[in-house]
A protein has these predicted regions:
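Alpha-helical scaffold elements that line and support the substrate/ligand-binding pocket
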Residues: 50, 140-147
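Long, low-complexity, intrinsically disordered cytosolic termini of multi-pass membrane proteins
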Residues: 349-351
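Membrane-interface helix-loop-helix regions
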Residues: 40, 54, 75-137, 141, ...
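Residues within membrane-spanning alpha-helices of integral membrane proteins
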Residues: 7, 11-14, 42-43, 49, ...
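Active-site helix-to-loop segments that bind/position phosphate- or nucleotide-bearing substrates
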Residues: 72
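Alpha-helical transmembrane segments in multi-pass integral membrane proteins
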Residues: 1-8, 12-36, 54-66, 116-122, ...
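Phosphate-coordinating loops and pocket residues in cytosolic domains that bind phosphorylated ligands
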Residues: 69
Length: 351
């Protein structure tokens, strides 16, 4: 079962990240408002991911092997291709990248979703946006480890585990990359999505009726404004992530509430399908636009760079999804899939 509102929200999340980088990349400084746009998109992806994992696996148990295979076949191939592409650029065209420097050790860690520090202190892989996929894979592995539990028990245990990790991270200032990364409070966003999925499975009154439609719309707007109203000297921390996560949850609940009244937009569905490709590949297109426009005009006009980057990123993602991502996924399902399969698990939502 495909939920249209989820597809549309996935498209919105990817576009938020694209717009943020299209605005940021030409600048020589970090604009906090633009950066928060990108973080908003990722937080929305994480909330959707938590929802999708619970929704697609149902109320009971599920085969963990099939679940993990489907997660790997959808996430790994394109991410590996993009990571290898970034590595090639770092070696042969480093001027296209701001802070990325290639080492074999970092390539291996990136491909295996192992967090590490870069030379500049950033806790991100070679393909910077892969940090979110490190969290996704961590979530998937823990979710699969509880496959033999019923959905409610699974969600409660995972929520307790993530709360414990967050508490440990708050009490201990880890310096090592792995414990510092996985005890960050951002992991709690998955719990928000999982909780909404439980409500949806039980046909909760929170997900029906005109009153709830108005409530979730108002809360979504209010929390969004609150997240962006934080002073610019406040970094992307819990004080920004809390309202933006609540805004993401509100818009997810709004979408589920009006699902039957939503138009069946082919463009919206297509962009939702291509959202993972858009998330992973858009920086290639943004960099290409900047290089081409700089050579053609001798200067970078911010508005032109932004609009051209967004347009090319969307078109490029649709192309990559149709002619690279989907064929690879089909081939893997035909040739390497486990003999016995569970119900299909939806596409990755964080990329």
């Amino acid at each position: 079962m495909r939920i249209r509102s989820i597809q549309y929200l996935r498209a919105v999340a990817a576009l938020l990240v694209v717009v943020a980088h299209a605005l940021l990349h030409p600048l020589n400084y970090m604009d906090p408002t633009y950066a928060r746009l990108g973080d908003y998109g990722v937080l929305l992806f994480f909330v959707i991911s938590g929802f999708i994992m619970v929704f697609t696996t149902g109320r009971g148990t599920f085969p963990p092997r099939d679940f993990l295979y489907r997660r790997i076949e959808r996430i790994v191939p394109l991410y590996w291709l993009v990571t290898i592409g970034v590595s090639i650029l770092a070696v042969y065209a480093p001027f296209l990248l701001k802070n990325t420097r290639f080492t074999w050790g970092q390539l291996v860690q990136s491909l295996l979703f192992i967090p590490f520090y870069r030379e500049n202190g950033d806790l991100v892989p070679l393909m910077k946006l892969g940090w979110s996929l490190n969290y996704e894979m961590f979530f998937y592995c823990l979710f699969a480890a509880m496959a033999l539990l019923r959905a409610t028990t699974r969600v409660l245990l995972l929520t307790c585990l993530f709360l414990l990790l967050t508490l440990i991270g708050a009490l201990i200032d880890f310096q090592a990359a792995i414990p510092r990364f996985y005890t960050a409070h951002v992991v709690l966003t998955f719990c928000v999505g999982m909780g909404i999925a439980l409500l949806y499975q039980r046909r909760s009154d929170l997900i029906r009726g005109p009153l709830m439609t108005a409530l979730w719309a108002i809360l979504g707007i209010m929390f969004t404004l609150l997240g962006f109203a934080q002073p610019h000297d406040v970094p992307i921390t819990i004080w920004v992530e809390i309202p933006l996560t609540l805004a993401s949850a509100s818009f997810l609940l709004l979408g589920l509430n009006i699902e039957r009244r939503l138009p069946n937009s082919r463009i919206g569905i297509a962009l939702g399908d291509a959202s993972y490709a858009m998330y992973l590949t858009h920086m290639y297109f943004v960099a290409a636009i900047i290089v081409v426009l700089h050579k053609l005009t001798g200067e970078l006009l911010p508005l032109l760079v932004t609009l051209a980057s967004i347009a090319l990123s969307v078109l490029g993602a649709l192309f990559v999804h149709r002619y690279i991502e989907r064929p690879i996924t089909r081939w893997l399902r035909r040739n390497l899939a486990p003999a016995k399969r569970s119900e299909p698990v939806a596409q990755p939502v964080s990329g």
